[in-house]
Every structure is written in C-alpha cells, then in structure tokens.
C-alpha cells in the first residue's frame, strides 16, 4: 500500500486543512466539508440540502460561472451528517482557492431566490418519489426511525419546502458554518512548495470568512423503532420490489466496546452481508436458479450520528419467498473463510484504486477527518482482523438488531 504525502494544519480558530500531494497527476481538487448534514437537528427537513443549493447564489449572480471562467468545475453534495463544496481544475489554484471560500463563506438569501429554489427542489423531490427503490427505502426508514430526520428525504418534504424562507436559512448557516465545524482539503498534482503556500492562504481566508465558535456537541436522543415491522405498499412496478432493513444498535457505542471505530464496523458489516447475499455468494446462484431473484441485490450499510442501518433491495416475482430467504441468510447464511479472504482482498484493491481517483480520495479523506479517523488505521484493521473475530463482531451486532421488510407491488 502506497503512503500518502499529506501536509496538514490546524489554525487557532479550530479550522483544519490538509493538502494531499499526488505528484504524477495534472488534475487538482479543493473542497470544504461541513460537519452538518440532512439528518442533523434543523428547523425544517431538507434545510441542509436547501442551504447547499442557495450558497451558489450571490449578489453578483451564480458563482459557478466564475469557476467556469477559470476552466474549473464546481459541485456540492449533502449527506446525512455532512455537506461538501468542491472544485476540480488543472490550473489557476490561486484564483480557485479564494472562490471556494467565497462560495462557502458568503450568503445571499432573498424571498425571490428562495421561492424559486423551493420550486426547483420540489421537482427534484417528486422525481425521487417516483423511483420504486426510493419508495421501498423510504418505507423502511419510516419504520426503522419514525418521526426523525433519517426517515425523511435529504431534500425535505413538500410542506418544509413551502415553509422555507431566508431567515431559516440564515439560522442554519450561522449555527453550523463556523471555523471549528469546517475542514479544507486539497488533492492532486501540487508541489510541496505549492502545498505550503495553499495552507498559508487558507489560514488568511478562513479567518476572513468564518466566525469562531466552540464546537457544538450534537445531541441525538434515542428513538424507538415502529412496532410495525412488515408492510406491503403499492406502486408503478411490473415486478415486485423487496426491501429488507436492519436497524443496528449504536455503532458508536458498539465500536467503543469492541475496540474499533464506527467506519471499521460499517465496512465489516458490509463485507458480511456481501458474503451472505452478494452476487458471488452460493445463495445468490441458487436463488437465481430457483427464480427467487431476478438480479443482484443492492446492499448498503449506513452509519450516521442518528442511527445506523442496512438496506437490502431487489426485484422478485416471489417477493415473500425472497424476504424469507434474505432474513435466513442475514442470520444463518453460510460464511466461508475463503469468501472472507476474498472480501478483504477486494476492499484492499478498491483502496489502492481510489488513490488514483483524485476526487474520491479527497472526499473520503475529508469525511474520515471529521470523525478523527485515518485511512491507514482502517486498512490495517481490515487486513489483520481474523476470521473468528469477524464472525463474532457480526453476531454481537446482529443480536442487538431488528429486521424490517417492505414489499412494493403493482397498483394494478
């Protein structure tokens, strides 16, 4: 595994920055990540995502055009616990850097531009809601984490979009966009000298644009799952869609008990579910022959501050049979050491490939930094964990988990 050359700095304000030097690449990346996302406390659902969109609006117009004039592209995303803004480019880092800070560090909210954005996001939400996989995933989350932001789409709800206004956006911004809640990352073909100069400029820019507040601890009171574990819903599908959700215990608390970090647990859980239910599992091949399943399952394990869960989604003309078999596999599925070793090799190979994907590498490094986690520590754990420890960890977590199911059938 190749070591990354990284130069880091923490400023007196608490703002953190790092430059990852990849000397053999022309491409460059700069981003600012915010330790705040869609499932964190906010007055209206979708507030974090709405704010992400509106930060591109400035008094002079859409700031994206300024990036384009430098032959740079800019984008952003909102996830459950973070928001990130970034730019990709080849040249002109000295011009791109202050633009990025202007993007994240200044606001321009008006009744007119907020109303217009509400209409745009409403169309985005409607598009998601028409997707059968979204419908199944949404129904599972409604049962696993009812009456929480996790149970609502990151884009919000129609009622929340109707209520959004400049004052609410200003409140979200002021509470979450401050020095100690932000981190900067650059990655790509920079020299050591350029990296040091970037960190000098970042120090000036963060001091100019962001206020200094003490880091706020986000409190997430425990939530109860729904008493209803199995539902059937109707939708526009030709083949029934099946969803199985696993609500895990707190991965943060479990990680402390097991001497791991939450990301390591997330990876190990993903590996186990792939071994038991993935396209290379013995079960999948047999299920295909028996026409229980049409195509590979979508398997995702998610860790958030508000709760952690897995969703397993697939299509089948025998939906009840598929659910029955998935539940059996989750609990009693065959685990071969050879499959475990293959999953480890696959994870290591993906890590190595990611080192050559400048944007993916930078985003993951920024995300890990927010949780005070390191890539090399996680990789070392995956490499060194024994087969027996792997199985014991899974059984321990599964023993404290609940399983929920959804079947999406045709309306006809």
Question: What are the residue ranges of the model-derived segments?
Answer:
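His/Glu-rich zincin catalytic helix
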Residues: 1-63, 170-286, 385, 393, ...
């Amino acid at each position: 595994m190749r070591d990354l050359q990284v130069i880091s700095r923490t400023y007196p304000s608490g703002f953190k920055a790092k430059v990852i030097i990849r000397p053999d690449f022309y491409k460059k990346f700069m981003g600012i990540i915010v330790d705040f996302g869609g499932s964190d406390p906010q007055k209206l659902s979708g507030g974090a995502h709405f704010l992400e969109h509106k930060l591109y609006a400035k008094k002079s117009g859409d700031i994206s055009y300024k990036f384009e004039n430098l032959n740079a592209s800019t984008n952003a995303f909102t996830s459950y616990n973070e928001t990130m803004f970034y730019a990709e480019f080849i040249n002109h880092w000295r011009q791109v850097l202050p633009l990025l800070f202007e993007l994240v560090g200044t606001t321009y909210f008006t009744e007119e531009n907020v109303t217009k954005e509400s209409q745009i996001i409403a169309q985005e939400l409607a598009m998601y809601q028409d997707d059968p996989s979204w419908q199944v995933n949404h129904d599972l989350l409604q049962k696993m984490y009812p009456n929480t932001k996790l149970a609502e789409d990151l884009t919000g709800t129609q009622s929340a979009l109707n209520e959004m206004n400049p004052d609410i956006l200003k409140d979200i911004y002021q509470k979450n966009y401050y020095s100690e809640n932000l981190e900067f990352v650059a990655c790509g073909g920079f020299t050591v000298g350029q990296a040091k100069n970037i960190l000098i400029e970042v120090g000036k820019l963060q001091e100019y644009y962001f206020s200094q507040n003490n880091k706020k601890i986000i409190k997430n009171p425990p939530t109860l799952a729904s008493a209803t574990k199995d539902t059937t819903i109707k939708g526009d599908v030709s083949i029934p869609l099946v969803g199985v959700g696993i609500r895990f215990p707190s991965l943060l608390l479990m990680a402390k008990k097991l001497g791991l970090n939450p990301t390591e647990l997330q990876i190990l859980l993903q590996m186990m579910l792939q071994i038991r239910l993935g396209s290379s599992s013995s079960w999948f091949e047999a299920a295909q022959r028996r026409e229980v399943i049409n195509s590979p399952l979508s398997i995702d394990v998610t860790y958030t501050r508000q709760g952690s869960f897995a969703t397993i989604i697939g299509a089948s003309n025998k939906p009840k049979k598929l659910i029955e078999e998935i539940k059996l596999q989750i609990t009693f599925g065959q685990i071969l050491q050879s499959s475990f070793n293959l999953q480890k090799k696959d994870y290591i190979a993906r890590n190595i490939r990611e080192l050559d994907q400048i944007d993916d590498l930078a985003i993951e490094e920024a995300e890990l930094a927010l949780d005070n986690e390191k890539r090399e520590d996680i990789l070392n754990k995956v490499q060194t964990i024994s087969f027996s420890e792997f199985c014991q960890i899974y059984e321990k977590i599964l023993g404290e988990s609940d399983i929920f199911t959804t079947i999406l059938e045709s309306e006809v």
